[in-house]
């Protein structure tokens, strides 16, 4: 999905029904939000969390959308926003002692990442 306005072009990618809780995905997204595409990929590669694999897939999809649909250069892209919302919960039951059953909640989430090109710095901004 792409969205264009007068000043900036934004490319968005969504990953729906990803297994894992939204709170665990958010702690990774908080670290890469506002970073460049290259820096975010390096960070995701070395983070010790299970949720980095689906986040990497969604990030690569957003960059591919920007490159193919909007003709943007991947080296100039930054992650403008990234969020995770909770999805449906799969309920399973585990047998326990004396005929009891404990419920197991297998959570899912929806991941969304949007990228845009970094603002060009003028000579005056670079010197300051």
UniProtKB/Swiss-Prot annotation:
This is Large ribosomal subunit protein uL22. It holds the Pfam family Ribosomal_L22. It comes from Prochlorococcus marinus (strain MIT 9215). Transmembrane segments: none annotated. It comes from the Bacteria. GO terms for cellular component: cytosolic large ribosomal subunit. GO terms for molecular function: rRNA binding; structural constituent of ribosome. One of its GO terms (biological process) is translation. PROSITE patterns: RIBOSOMAL_L22. The gene is rplV. CDD domains: Ribosomal_L22 (cd00336). Part of the 50S ribosomal subunit. The lineage of its organism: Bacteria, Bacillati, Cyanobacteriota, Cyanophyceae, Synechococcales. Belongs to the universal ribosomal protein uL22 family. This protein binds specifically to 23S rRNA; its binding is stimulated by other ribosomal proteins, e.g. L4, L17, and L20. It is important during the early stages of 50S assembly. It makes multiple contacts with different domains of the 23S rRNA in the assembled 50S subunit and ribosome. Keywords: Ribonucleoprotein, Ribosomal protein, RNA-binding, rRNA-binding.
